[in-house]
Design a protein with these regions (language model features):
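Core catalytic lobe of class I
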Residues: 1-226, 270-271
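S-adenosyl-L-methionine
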Residues: 1-6, 229-266
Length: 271
């Protein structure tokens, strides 16, 4: 995350979602669609020493804290490879951890080694910027989404479906369902959301569908092109409706709460 890029934003954000490198690309293999595949994601995801990982996480979390409103919150996804480092950095920087969400995948990949339990979860830390400044939490909406019961910190959702790959896919792409729930839980209409590791801009697509505004940072040109294609795809109302039809949480919103004309790319040019 480049400090010079964050300076371009002369305002602060209501929410940040970050999907930083997990540093798990170590030459391992997995099974996908009946085929053995390598789990390496790219050079940016190759393992680091504990010291290097801590320094990396400390730097980008410090920059994010500077761009977050005092009542803002940040969501960070990870696995055991990086999530403990992230939690330590959050605490040292003065954030207050609110929850650690367990995302239980309903369609996890097969464990072909049969030497340990099958990995079926990822984690998402939810933290606020300040220790004593109240944060936004749309409690009643979350309760409504959960059939009138309190929403727990275990969310059962599938990984990305084919309907999310129509423009191509990112190797660590998160499902729209996951981002929509975070956004609905912690932001209001018109709020600004930042993703410092934007990838294919799933956060941006989810933000737009929920009526929020979005800015993302991404250094890989190929992923920027993929993001632009995905944004252009949902400028078509039929394509919007297809996505909305797959995301149960959006069915609870009034149609007036969802954006029909895309705001992201207006205030800040798309790069």
């Amino acid at each position: 995350m480049n400090k010079k890029l964050t300076i371009e934003f002369d305002f602060k954000f209501d929410m940040i979602f970050a999907d930083p490198p997990y540093f798990l690309s170590n030459g391992g293999i997995s099974l996908q669609s009946g085929k053995v595949v390598c789990v390496n994601k790219g050079e940016w995801d190759k393992g680091k020493s504990q010291e290097d990982m801590m320094a990396f996480n400390m730097e980008w979390l410090r920059l994010c804290r500077d761009k977050l409103k005092d009542n803002g919150t940040i969501w960070i996804s990870g696995t055991y490879h990086n999530i403990f480092s992230v939690a330590n950095c959050l605490t040292e920087l003065g954030y207050k951890i609110l929850n650690v969400i367990t995302w239980e995948k309903t369609n996890p990949p097969v464990n072909i080694s049969c030497r340990y339990f099958k990995y079926s979860t990822e984690f998402v830390i939810w933290a606020r910027k300040m220790q004593k400044v109240p944060h936004k939490f749309n409690y009643e909406l979350m309760k409504e989404l959960n059939e009138g019961k309190q929403m727990t910190d275990v969310w059962r959702m599938p990984a990305i479906g084919r309907w999310e790959k129509t423009c191509g896919k990112h190797p660590t792409q998160k499902p729209l369902r996951l981002l929509v729930r975070m956004i609905l839980a912690s932001t209001n209409q018109g709020d600004w959301i930042l993703d410092p590791f934007s990838g294919s801009s799933t956060t941006g697509i989810a933000a737009n569908l929920c009526g929020r505004r979005f800015a993302g940072l991404e250094k890989e040109e190929g992923f920027c092109k993929l993001s632009k294609a995905r944004r252009e795809e949902i400028e078509n109302l039929n394509n919007q409706n297809i996505l909305i039809g797959h995301i149960d949480d959006l069915h609870f919103l009034e149609s007036s709460d969802m954006v029909r004309e895309m705001p992201y790319g207006d205030e800040i040019p798309f790069h």
